[in-house]
C-alpha cells in the first residue's frame, strides 16, 4: 500500500473546526479505500506563539519539510495583535512558503451553479465558471531590492520598490501553467504589462519561448494585465488558466474570486519545484478565507474551502484524480440540495453548522465513490 504523508496545521480561529471535517474524509478514505494517509499535526500562527513563542516551531517546520504535503487552516486574531512583528501569526505561513520554496500559487475561481445568484455579475456570466490563476509567488516587486524609503533631505521622501524577474523564475511558473492547462481545457493566457515595464517584456518573451520549446500543443494567448482585469469582469468564462507575476496575480486572483460570489469558499495551493529524484513537488494547501475569530468555536463556520483545499491536495500532490473529482462533485451536489452554512444562506435553503455540512459532503462523497 502506498504511504501518503500529510502534515496538518489547523492554526487559529475556525481553522481547527474546518480541519476536523477533513479528518473525517481522511478517516473514511483510509478505512474504506486503503488510501494510506499517515497524518501528523502541529501548531502554527497564534497557537504556536502561545506554546513556543514562535509562529511555527523548528520541530513542526521539520515535519512540514518531511511531509508529502501540508494542509493549512488559518492564522491570526486580535489576541495576537500586539506580539512582535517577527513572530506574528502570519509569519508562520511566510516561513512555510520560504522554507518549502513554494513559488507557484494556484487560485481557482469556481462558481458553483447553485450559488450563481450570489455573484455581483449576472448569473449567466458566471454560472459554471472555472478559472485557475497561476501566480508567481516568490519574485517580483514584493521581493526585489532595493526596497526602501529614502529621505531626500528637502522635506521630501522617496519610496522605492523594485520589480525584478530572472529568466528561470518565469520559465518555471510558465511550465506549471502549461502543465496544468493540459489537465484542463488546454488554454493559457499570460498577463503582464510589456507596454510600460521591462520585466513585462522579458515575461512575454520567456513565456513565448517556453511555450514554443515544450508546450506548443497548448493554446497560448498574451494579454496586458489591466485589459485582463477588464475581461475578467466582462467575459470571465473565456479564460481557462491565467499565468501572471506576483503583483498582478495578487490582484487578479482576488478579482476572479469575487466573481464567484463566495470568496470564503475557495481553496488554494502553493507548489514548489519537482524533486530531482522523485519528481514530487513540495506543496501547501489552504483555504482563501481567514481565521474568522468572531465565530471560532461556535460550530457555524463553513468548512467547504478547507475540504476543497484537500481536494486540490488529492489532485496535485497524490494524483488521486478520481477522488478529487468526486470530492468536488460532492460539494456541488450538497449545494444543489440547498444545504447551506450561515454565510451562504439563501431563501428556501436549509441552514446547517460546520459538522453537519461536513457530514453531508462526506455522505455524498461516499455515494459517488461506491
Swiss-Prot record:
Stored InterPro entries: IsoCit/isopropylmalate_DH_CS (IPR019818), IsoPropMal-DH-like_dom (IPR024084), Isopropylmalate_DH (IPR004429)
GO molecular function: 3-isopropylmalate dehydrogenase activity; magnesium ion binding; NAD binding
Residues the entry annotates as binding substrate: 97, 107, 135, 226
Cofactor dependence: Mg(2+); Mn(2+)
UniProt keywords, alphabetically: Amino-acid biosynthesis, Branched-chain amino acid biosynthesis, Cytoplasm, Leucine biosynthesis, Magnesium, Manganese, Metal-binding, NAD, Oxidoreductase
Cellular compartments annotated: Cytoplasm
Enzyme nomenclature, EC number: 1.1.1.85
One Pfam family here: Iso_dh
A GO biological process held by the record: L-leucine biosynthetic process
Binding positions for NAD(+) per the UniProt entry: 77-90, 290-302
Reaction it catalyzes: (2R,3S)-3-isopropylmalate + NAD(+) = 4-methyl-2-oxopentanoate + CO2 + NADH
NAD among keywords: yes
Cofactor annotation comment: Binds 1 Mg(2+) or Mn(2+) ion per subunit.
List of residues binding Mg(2+): 226, 250, 254
Principal localisation: cytoplasm
A cellular component annotation (GO) from this entry: cytosol
Residues flagged as site, Important for catalysis: 142, 193
Pathway: Amino-acid biosynthesis; L-leucine biosynthesis; L-leucine from 3-methyl-2-oxobutanoate: step 3/4
PANTHER family for the chain: 3-ISOPROPYLMALATE DEHYDROGENASE
NCBIfam families found in the cross-reference section: leuB
Record function comment: Catalyzes the oxidation of 3-carboxy-2-hydroxy-4-methylpentanoate (3-isopropylmalate) to 3-carboxy-4-methyl-2-oxopentanoate. The product decarboxylates to 4-methyl-2 oxopentanoate.
Subunit structure: Homodimer.
Family that this chain belongs to: Belongs to the isocitrate and isopropylmalate dehydrogenases family. LeuB type 1 subfamily.
HAMAP family, alphabetized: LeuB_type1
Name of the protein in question: 3-isopropylmalate dehydrogenase
Lineage: Bacteria, Pseudomonadati, Pseudomonadota, Alphaproteobacteria, Hyphomicrobiales
Gene: leuB
